[in-house]
């Protein structure tokens, strides 16, 4: 028998911020949750400012485009703080990471 599948991730977010993101960028936080399904995605700590909590940036592809999702973990849930399409520097770095990754 194979390994048990991982439990589904649970997400939460501020609905007003999600709606503002939709108005500004054309997609909301619900759409951004798809980035976490990217098996070649990765996360890194977000230490740009002293936020008072651990924050992370997750890089994952949705429909062939790279997205950045900033989030924290609260009570076993992923709380999305912001999301955007990756910039050209991030896209290039992600491509290099994938090229350098060992084959599974």
How should each PLM-predicted stretch be described?
Residues 1-104:
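Ribonuclease/tRNase effector modules and their secretory precursors
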């Amino acid at each position: 028998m194979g390994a048990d599948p991982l439990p589904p991730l649970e997400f939460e977010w501020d609905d007003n911020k999600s709606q503002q993101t939709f108005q500004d960028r054309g997609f909301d936080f619900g759409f951004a949750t798809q980035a976490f399904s990217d098996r070649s995605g990765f996360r890194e700590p977000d230490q740009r400012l002293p936020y008072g909590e651990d924050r992370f940036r997750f890089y994952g592809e949705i429909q062939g485009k790279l997205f950045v999702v900033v989030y924290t973990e609260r009570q076993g849930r992923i709380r999305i703080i912001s999301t955007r399409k990756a910039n050209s520097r991030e896209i290039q770095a992600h491509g290099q990471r994938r090229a350098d990754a060992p084959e599974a």
